[in-house]
Amino acid sequence: MVSTDLPPLIELRGIRKRYGGGDKPEVEVLHGIDLDIRAGEFIAIVGSSGSGKSTLMHLLGCLDRPSSGSYRFAGEDVSTFGSDELAWLRRKAFGFVFQGYHLIPTESARENVEIPAIYAGLPPGERMQRAADLLGRLGLSDKLNNRPNQLSGGQQQRVSIARALMNGGHIILADEPTGALDSRSGAEVMELLRELAGAGHTVILITHDRDVAAQAQRVVEIRDGRIVADSVTDRQPSEQPLLHHAGLSSLEMTQAHEDTGTPFWQGLHETIRAAWRVMWIHRVRTSLTLLGIVIGVASVIVMLAIGEGTKQRVIDQMGSMGTTIMYMSSDVPSTGGPVGVITEEDLDEVARLPEISRVMPVIGDPILVRHQNVDKQIYVFSSPYIMPMVHHWRVAQGRFFTETEDRELAPVVVLGHKIYRSFFPHLSNPVGQYLLIGTSPFEVIGVMAERGAESGSQNYDDMVFIPYRAGRARVYQAQEQPDYIVMEAASMDQVQEAEEAIRALLLERHGREDFRIGNAAARLKTQLETRDTMTRMLGLVAAVSLLVGGIGVMNVMLMTVRERTREIGIRMATGAREYDILSQFLIEAMLVTITGGTVGVILGLTVGALLVFWEVPVVFSFGVMIGAFACAVITGLIFGYMPARTAARLDPVVALSSE
């Protein structure tokens, strides 16, 4: 028997527990309970259904708080403890054995037993060995990796007892431990509890069965929320050596106020493992949740890559045309009057300006071009011999026409790359062939290198190029006025000065501004601003899809919290702090988004590679990929916080009683 001279380990004075209040009727289920329990006692609290025994057990195990009264544990007033201090007490002092076993269905027997040690910060190797040893002593050495649904009721209750002993189990709280078992399994469980009492554990047995209660050393009867009897039996605890070395250690209550729990990094691996297992078990739902994040991340990457690729193509095209290029054409004066006329004399004067290096008049129009039985409407570009130099464009085959050929109206033509492929698909070198342009035959003397379209203009590869004077005389019916003039500034720094000098010169010669001047740099700026706007719009659409994915994560996590409410209660009963539950569900949400973000990046790169294959301009940015991935993770953090916070704030008693 336990000496009554010892100070009580647990001391209850005037404990009352009320439920309801506010707009609901208040109900008191415990009415001034006074109870002392000493270390090493094997005590049974017996009562019928509704007597208040389960409520008393919840208060004893620090799963709930009394409405009034005093609860002292090892001399400390528990009513002053915060939630983390109560979690420490459950983790270090108590071990729970429930009627419904309360094992986490996704974990193996050993993993269920390890749970209290995870929150106690025990190293993985030591934790696994201790769990295996406890299960071995309880006759379950061959069931370490079995899930709860692969165990009998008696075996599940043994796992529950092993879990209660994992952190030492100074006090074993057994709530109807034989209620769901057959008589044989029930007898085995009671024998184990007697052995625990004999090994020095304090065992508190909650039961409605007086025969079961009679196996304890002390029986306390509770009825209608009051203790009506407290008697001592003649039963002695079992002296079997099975659990003599269960790992009891002294409790230092001062640690309750100092212990900060398991460091985040130490339990991270276990949390990720558990989260990954839950994701795998619910893989269809997880996949559908991931889909929103995957599409969002991939959309951001692909859309911004297309925007950047298009922007880069504009820069390359405009750059290849020359950022020192300016364009001039006739215009209607702002004051009214006829369209201005730019003469050759005007061009000669412009060419003499020191800020100008080249002047190139251009006439161009779609003309019917024929070769044998193939004819096409093609843009015929008529310009002086300096065109390749002005536009920084090389000849791929043959040559470009010369100044002499231009001056002598030579009927020669240079083909754009696509025109060459269109008219001569099977000919490796078309030089020497003839095309009929309008009604005039022209000899092919060269093919330009592939170039593409200048943004906002016709594709240069779809053109043919003829001398300026030959074009005026042979194709454009002696047209005197050029359609527009291309001018090249002496340097990029002089573009603005050159434009002002041309404007001043022509104003002096014409007396009015009947012309229009633009430069490639201004066009480039306009084009880039347009592309940037489009890119921002594309990015916004992609960001919205990522936001929708985040909302999907939140919905699924809220559903997960509801489905796993009992698991949350089990973890709290085994010593998890609010922070532990919060971090667990936050990590689960982030793991979903990290996985989705990773798959999204891979999908985005894959789609981008296909777009490149289809010749769509795409430029991937490592920064965009990192940003999209980071946004996915932050989305998981933000949208996972509310479900995680909901889980962390659950009442342990309510959580344990959920179905």
From Swiss-Prot:
Q: Name one GO cellular component term.
A: plasma membrane
The biological processes this protein is annotated with in GO are:
response to antibiotic
Keywords (A to Z) from UniProt: Antibiotic resistance, ATP-binding, Cell inner membrane, Cell membrane, Membrane, Nucleotide-binding, Translocase, Transmembrane, Transmembrane helix, Transport
Q: Where is the ABC transporter domain?
A: 10-249
In the record, what terms sit under GO molecular function?
ATP binding; ATP hydrolysis activity; transmembrane transporter activity
Briefly state the protein's biological role: Non-canonical ABC transporter that contains transmembrane domains (TMD), which form a pore in the inner membrane, and an ATP-binding domain (NBD), which is responsible for energy generation. Confers resistance against macrolides.
From the Swiss-Prot or TrEMBL record, state where the protein is found. Answer: Cell inner membrane
Q: Which domain of life is it from?
A: Bacteria
Binding positions (ATP): 47-54
Q: Enumerate the SUPFAM superfamilies for this protein.
A: P-loop containing nucleoside triphosphate hydrolases (SSF52540)
| Top-tier EC class | translocase
Q: According to its record, how does it sit in the membrane? A: Multi-pass membrane protein
Report what the protein is called: Macrolide export ATP-binding/permease protein MacB
Family per record: Belongs to the ABC transporter superfamily. Macrolide exporter (TC 3.A.1.122) family.
What is the organism of origin for this protein?
Nitrosomonas europaea (strain ATCC 19718 / CIP 103999 / KCTC 2705 / NBRC 14298)
Q: Where does the chain cross the membrane?
A: 287-307, 538-558, 594-614, 619-639
Q: How does it assemble?
A: Homodimer.
